Regions:
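Bacterial extracytoplasmic/cell-wall-associated proteins, especially those involved in peptidoglycan
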Residues: 1-145
């Protein structure tokens, strides 16, 4: 739900659902991690100085943070608070996320897209993708395999 909120809170329901669709498509792909949380948090991490200085700590006890600007979803590693402030959008994101997870469905709005970006930017990576559709302020792409 946090991913839907931060990536598409200004979008209509279809735009928010499409972002969720991409997240689910990534979970189902062998090219990405196999859980929603790991898909959202995918990217470079660094270990906190608080745990790095203790070599005997287990991996579960270590604290990691995302490297700013080096993650799949920009809100995850932008250094800002992730606490939702726009409650109407947050509740809508929660409802959509619950529906998608509980029913294990997507509406197929993105026809299998596994990437997207805001329509006001033109990243280099989209040169190697197939443009599927535009929904709201986002363009959705499918990887060429």
């Amino acid at each position: 739900a946090l991913n839907l909120y931060h990536e598409a809170r200004s979008e209509r329901t279809a735009g928010m659902w499409a972002v969720g669709d991409v997240t689910i498509n990534r979970v189902k792909s062998i090219s990405f991690p196999n859980t929603i949380c790991n898909v959202v948090k995918q990217g470079r991490m660094y270990e906190s100085w608080k745990t790095k200085r203790y070599p005997d700590l287990s991996e579960e006890e270590r604290i990691y943070y995302p490297v700013k600007g080096k993650c799949q979803f920009s809100w995850w590693c932008d250094g800002k608070s992730d606490v939702p402030e726009e409650l109407d959008s947050w509740y809508r994101a929660l409802d959509i996320a619950r529906l998608m997870i509980d029913s294990d469905i997507g509406l197929g709005l993105t026809d299998g897209a596994d990437h997207y970006h805001a329509d006001y930017i033109d990243p280099d990576w989209n040169d190697h993708m197939i443009l599927i559709t535009t929904i709201g302020n986002h363009k959705f792409y499918k990887s060429i395999r």
